Amino acid sequence: MKNGDDNLKVFVIRHGKVDFFWSRSCTSEQFDKECEEYDKSPIRKENIRFPEIKCQKIYVSTLSRSRETAKEIFGEKEFMESKLIHEVPLRSAFDTTKKLPLWFWNTAGRLQWFVNSKRQPEGRYQTHKRAKQFVKRLCIENEDCAIVTHGFYMHTLIKEMKRAGFTIEKNALHYKNGQAIVCSK
């Protein structure tokens, strides 16, 4: 069901802040373990002022932090779960027993993602492909909706939405936890 002004409105929301504390430096094995633990961690119960959003369809990823955030915003409703809006997975850039800083592991892993390194579980091409697939689905369904997704993935999703003709309320280099971006077509 579309809103009253006949424009398709999609609210892209970054999940709430995760209740997890990363080590400042770690070995490759420790980093990989922390990435797994982060993906299983709940969101913090903070007083985040989420925007008031009314829509029929709410998409969440398969990661619990997405669903928990959706419950905080929309209450107990039926959510449409999709792997297409899952965060871009991350792992260590190489194996080492030497402890390296967290910023190094994050940067090196995302650089490998960018060049489609087989070391990373998913490369940039794969991420763009699933974002494009999800945007195509949104355009076919043509219903106002909310998407509770993840920070790194949001950049790719919003880029694909622009390519599909959506107008983006505001772009950012970094999307804050709980931030909603309004996309309309």
What are these regions (language model features)?
Residues 2-84, 101-132, 176-179, 184:
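Active-site-proximal alpha-helix that buttresses catalytic centers in soluble enzyme cores
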Residues 63, 85-87, 161-166:
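Proteins with a high burden of low-complexity, intrinsically disordered sequence enriched in S/T/G/P/A and R
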Residues 28, 96-100, 163:
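Residues in and immediately flanking transmembrane alpha helices
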Residues 26-29, 71, 83, 92, ...:
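A generic "cationic amphipathic patch" detector
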Residues 84-99:
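Signature for phosphate-centric chemistry
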Residues 2-8, 20, 24, 132-185:
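Active-site-adjacent alpha-helix immediately C-terminal to a catalytic or transition-state-stabilizing loop
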